[in-house]
Structure formats: C-alpha cells, structure tokens
Amino acid sequence: MNLVSIIMPTYNCGRFIKESIDSVLAQTYDNWELLIVDDCSTDDTEAIVRGYKDKRIHYMCNEQNIGAALTRNRALREAKGRYIAFLDADDLWLPEKLEKQVAFMGQHGYQFSYTYYSEMDSDGIDTGITVKGPFKITKAGMYAFCWPGCLTVMYDAQSIGLIQIEDIQKNNDYALWLKICKKADCYLLPEVLARYRRGRSGSVSSQRISTMIKWHYKLYRDAEMMQVIPSLWHTTMNIICGAYKKIKYVKHN
C-alpha cells in the first residue's frame, strides 16, 4: 500500500481545521501522512492540531508569514509519499476519497488525476451544487483553464518529481497544475469525493471578473514567465473557459 502525502497549508483556519483533519482520519485508506504547515496563524489553529496524537499528523509552523505558495512548497519538500494529495484546512473529503483515487490511478497507470466535488456554504450546509469536468486534460487544456478543484487532485510524485512554484499571491494551486501538466495529462475519476467550502476569503473564483483577469495574467507572467501576448491570450481563454465550465460542468441538483 503506497504512502499518500496530504498537503494542508493553513492560516487562521481554527474554525474549520478540526473538521478537515477528521475527514482525513475517516479515510478508508490508512497509509497516509498529513503535513500541516501553518503560516503563522494568530488563532487557535496550533492548539487544535496539537490536540491530535496520531503520529501520521505532522504540524510545522513557518518562522514568519510567507504566503500560501511558499507554505505549500515547504510541505511538498517534506512529503515522503509516492502520491501527493491536497486538502485546504477548510475543505472536506468523503471517506473513500484516497482509496478510490489511488486505485483509479494504479489500475490505469495515470500519474495525475482529479475528481468531482460538491459545494457547501461557510457553515457546512450543502448548496446543491456539484462541479464536474472533462475526462482528460492535456497541457493545452490545463493552460486554457484550471479545471480541477485543488481538494480533488492527486499526482504520482515518483513519476513527476518534486514540484515547486514561484512566490505568487494567488492561483498557487493552478501554478502547480501548470508544472505537472508538462509531464502528464490529468484524468478524471467521475465521482464526488470531496466537499469545497464556498465563500472563503481571498478565493479568486469568488471575485469579480476584473480581479480574476489581474491574477490570471500575473500567473502566466510571473509563475510561467510568459511574454505579454501569450499571457493575455491564456488569460482571455481562462475567462471564456470559465463561462463554459459554468454551463457544461457546474450542476445544480
């Protein structure tokens, strides 16, 4: 049974992190390590995490606040698992998430995968929305739009290797996918295996279109080191594909 390293950066998520950790502890697949990297929270995050005595849970705190991108990088450097999975400190997994996704990748020889997820509000109440996506995302497809939800992604670190991203303020999960998609296509496991907490502070997807354009443009310029014209092109494609996703893949139950 291969080890799965779960990457959980956190900052002032004391209200939600216990529920997120409990969703990891409830997994039917038990060979995992949970790497919680705290970016200098000022709430009770540390006390909550240290209340867990499970040796698979590892808590680290940055010496100073360095932002989500570098915090995620630190967790990735510490990871020992063959597979890398991601769970933000306010999101949740369903119990069979790891078991089903590891099996899916192993059976088909996939190196990079994602799943459907449902949405809940800030109080954990189901909104009736399910987010799906295309079965296969190529490099071109990933550059066109960030199809996977971060909480659903898993990749084979044995094949992909260590991934580190630039110090960007937003879209750092998307920056990771753009690195990985150069080495492997991303495949969909078509089942809801995670719950995303909608309405979180700072989420790019919850901001107005002008703000989304700004952060996507900076992603291509700063993280991918693209020239102006290609950056503008991919930013435009992101806006178009975002509208398409809402029509094609965001389902109201």
Question: Positions of the model-derived regions?
Answer:
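A conserved acidic beta->alpha catalytic loop
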Residues: 23, 30, 38-47, 64, ...
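The conserved acidic donor/metal-binding loop of glycosyltransferases
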Residues: 88-92, 116
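Conserved nucleotide-sugar donor-binding catalytic segment
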Residues: 77, 130-211, 215-216
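Acidic helix N-cap motif at the loop->helix transition within catalytic regions
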Residues: 15-18, 43-51, 92, 96
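Conserved donor NDP-sugar-binding/catalytic core segment of glycosyltransferases
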Residues: 96-127
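N-proximal low-complexity "stem/linker" segments adjacent to membrane-targeting elements
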Residues: 1-25
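Glycine-rich, basic loop-to-helix element that forms the pyrophosphate-binding segment
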Residues: 62-79, 100
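Short aromatic/hydrophobic "clamp" motif used to bind/position activated sugar donors
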Residues: 84
